[in-house]
Amino acid sequence: MENVNFTLNLFIEYLQIEKNYSEYTIACYKHDIGEFFEFMEREQIKQLQQVSYSDVRLFLTELHQRKQSSRSIARKMSSLRSFYKFLLREKIVSENPFALASLPKKEQKIPHFLYPDELEQLFVVNDLNTAIGQRNQAMIELLYATGIRVSECCNIRLSHIDFSVCTILISGKGNKQRYVPFGTYAKEALERYIQDGRQQLASKAKTPTDVLFLNARGGALTPRGVRHILNDIVERAALSLKVSPHTFRHTFATHLLNEGADLRSVQELLGHAHLSSTQVYTHVTKDHLRYVYLHSHPRA
């Protein structure tokens, strides 16, 4: 399987350099393709060129037998389809057996989001007299104010922020750039952190950096670091909820749409290439439904 692993490394390079995908996305591709490589070993398939449509169907059957969700199976098949598309382009294989496979319909899950009172509990636990507390407050205020992805948050540089018009230049998926606005709360938290806490953290760095969010050693904060920080904040807020960076993104979109923002504008703010990606947020909270009903129905 040496040649197979070498080919995977070529594909990963392509995702990093040409597609500019995040570390998390690339890790998902590696996991999905690695799972298929294990299947190839079990079936004694030595070369990628030898994989047939029958093998793909057998792999699909295995995934279903292991009770994997439709969403998970669809992602794996999509990863492998992209992998073979790359192999075709590089003339490593002569056909894409995954192109013929129909993807299972994804389950449409309503994204988990936070209510205002739950958000408030997260915003009051950080000690604003410390550098770490100032950084954490600025980070969660910004995540909620902008709906940016965790990878985008970690890539923000000081030069990307324009306080005069309260906007940030964001580099999104595929290196696509967009400007996102932020409000008063985020502005105050960012200014406090940049003027005080960030300088304290930056003084510990071996090499200077203009990345906005720094870790305790003065280096750039990573997506994994952000997730760890959020887990700690949620624990201190005594919330019995699972909150990830993406929860803030879901919350941002849900709150905007519930307050009357149009779908196209939210699509632009989130940096979605397709409107269908944004439409998942068109659910509304039960409280909002109740409010609309009470204020609109003649006999409510």
From Swiss-Prot:
The active site is at residues 149, 173, 246, 249, 272, 281. Keywords: Cell cycle, Cell division, Chromosome partition, Cytoplasm, DNA integration, DNA recombination, DNA-binding. GO terms for molecular function: DNA binding; tyrosine-based site-specific recombinase activity. Residues 2-88 form the Core-binding (CB) domain. Residues 109-294 form the Tyr recombinase domain. Its main location: cytoplasm. It is found in: Cytoplasm. Transmembrane segments: none annotated. CDD domains: INT_XerDC_C. It holds the Pfam family Phage_int_SAM_1. One of its GO terms (biological process) is DNA transposition. GO terms for cellular component: cytoplasm. Belongs to the 'phage' integrase family. XerC subfamily. Forms a cyclic heterotetrameric complex composed of two molecules of XerC and two molecules of XerD. Site-specific tyrosine recombinase, which acts by catalyzing the cutting and rejoining of the recombining DNA molecules. The XerC-XerD complex is essential to convert dimers of the bacterial chromosome into monomers to permit their segregation at cell division. It also contributes to the segregational stability of plasmids. NCBIfam families: PRK00283.1 (NF001399), recomb_XerA_Arch (NF040815), recomb_XerC (TIGR02224), recomb_XerD (TIGR02225). This is Tyrosine recombinase XerC. The gene is xerC.
